[in-house]
């Protein structure tokens, strides 16, 4: 799962 705060993986 994408980690919030880390680009380019951003949770909107």
UniProtKB/Swiss-Prot annotation:
It is found in: Secreted. The keyword Cell division does not apply. Keywords: Amphibian defense peptide, G-protein coupled receptor impairing toxin, Secreted, Toxin, Vasoactive, Vasodilator. The keyword Iron-sulfur does not apply. GO terms for biological process: blood vessel diameter maintenance; defense response; vasodilation. Transmembrane segments: none annotated. GO terms for cellular component: extracellular region. GO terms for molecular function: toxin activity. It comes from the Eukaryota. Expressed by the skin glands. Belongs to the bradykinin-related peptide family. Induces relaxation of mouse trachea that has been precontracted with methacholine. May induce relaxation of arterial smooth muscle. May target bradykinin receptors (BDKRB). This is Bradykinin-like peptide AV-12. It comes from Ascaphus truei. The lineage of its organism: Eukaryota, Metazoa, Chordata, Craniata, Vertebrata.
């Amino acid at each position: 799962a994408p980690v919030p705060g880390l680009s380019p993986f951003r949770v909107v």
